[in-house]
Each structure stands twice: as structure tokens, then as C-alpha cells.
């Protein structure tokens, strides 16, 4: 195990006990989550060594990599993903109607395919060999395994949909992504928000913690601190309202001894409604998309 003793964002060493969370998906091990007393970044620590992280993704329940779904939550996930592909494209075309796009952590490639069909020049990065192969078949292009495989390519838009929380080298990854951004380009970073109403409701059983796959856990404050630390400027924050329903249903499953039934779906739906209602004033939704650009004039 690797013990993180310093916040990578603000370099503060005062990491305070926050939650003890179970890995409900694969190992059923318990992991500690600590919170930086200065910037509020929450950190899974101790965490598995980087070379051992892959085994914690080896489950058909990890839908974004397996492409498989079963049961009520799997159905909800697939339904939400189908809608979100078009929704994400619309968010991007608010800024540009065409150009080059890098999807960092592209999974099985559905979002890239959506952008390809809209005449965008697409590039994808995906570390999972199985997901990468599916993305290559779907899009008929080479998908890179890591950022290090890119040379001096630059992009008008870079997207990281629920992936930054997975990377071991947080600061270095954001710095590398910034280096591949064209002048005037925008990076879209989507992550769970551990200060959302549904996170406050479910606490250590909140599915958004997803330890140990999620190594970092963000609040709006900590994400803004991260962006500023690498010279990126936050230009907008967009809620992902559907996430509250899916995450709440999973959280209800965890409360129900990891068994999904109709009551979990109903309670999760109600919790999602409640979370979205309470999140309105402060834009404190279950998941948020942060739009950032370089602060260079």
C-alpha cells in the first residue's frame, strides 16, 4: 500500500480522517479517505500500488470498461449514458461546432463515436486493453494507452469524463493535458462532488467514493485549487443531474447489503430528486463538469 502524506494540490500535510469506505464492487476491502485541511481535496490513503490497481477494475459490474450491464442499475446506467452522449456533444458545440477533440479515458469509445459522426477529428486515450480494443473497433482508429504516447499534438477540446479521480499522478496528469490544449481551447473535467446532498446523505456508503478506483475526491473548492495550481482558469461549472439518480440507486444497494431490489431503485430515484432540488442554489450537484482554459492572455 502507498500512504499519501502530502496533498498534491496545495502541498499541505494536514490530512484529516474523513471516512472509512468499503469497496463494494470488487474486493470488499475497506479504505480510508482523508481530507486536506487546507484545500479540501479528499484522498484515498493508503491506496494500492499503481501496478496493483488494475485488479480492482476486474468486474463486469464496472460497466464503463466492460460494456456489459445487468439488472436495474445497469439498465439505468445504459439509458443515462445514451442520453448523455448527445447531451455532452451539445455542451461542447456551445463553444465549437467542429475541430479536434481528445477524450482522455475514453472507455469503450461511445463518446468518441458520437463526436466522429458529428465530423470532429477524434483522438482517444484509454489504459484498459479490453476497453481500448472495443473503442478502436467502434471508431476505426488507434486509441492510445497513455498521454505519454502523444507527441506534440494539440486539441481544441479535451474531455475527461469521470477519469481524473482515477489517475495516480493527479497534478502531472492535469499539467500534461494542459500542454495538449490549443490556444483558446477548453478542457472539460467531470468528477463526483463529495459535498453534494446525496453524498452528505449516504456518507461512507455514497457510491461516488468508489474506493480504491477513485483515488481523489473533489469539492468545488479543491477542483478550483487544482486548476489554478497548473495555470488553468475555471470558466464555467455545469451540473450532471442524471448522476444523482444512478449514484443514489447504487448507494441504496450498498445500504441493502449490496443487494439490488425494487426498493433500492425507488429510494434511489427519490434521493436523486431530493439531491438535485437541494443542489440548485449553490450548483452543488452529485457530479459537476468544470470547464477550464489556460490563463494566458
Which positions does each model-derived feature cover?
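A SAM-dependent methyltransferase catalytic signature shared across enzymes that methylate proteins
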Residues: 8-16, 220-239, 266-267
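Short glycine/proline- and charge-enriched loop/turn segments
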Residues: 70-73, 202-210, 250-257
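Conserved SAM-binding loop
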Residues: 3-5, 83-203, 215-229, 287-294
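Conserved class I S-adenosyl-L-methionine
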Residues: 50-96, 114
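Short low-complexity, flexible loop/linker segments enriched in glycine and/or proline
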Residues: 32-33, 137-141, 204-205, 249-253
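A C-terminal cap/extension of S-adenosyl-L-methionine-dependent methyltransferases
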Residues: 1-5, 18-25, 236-297
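Acceptor-substrate binding/catalytic loop of class I
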Residues: 30, 207-220
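N-terminal juxtadomain amphipathic helix
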Residues: 1-71
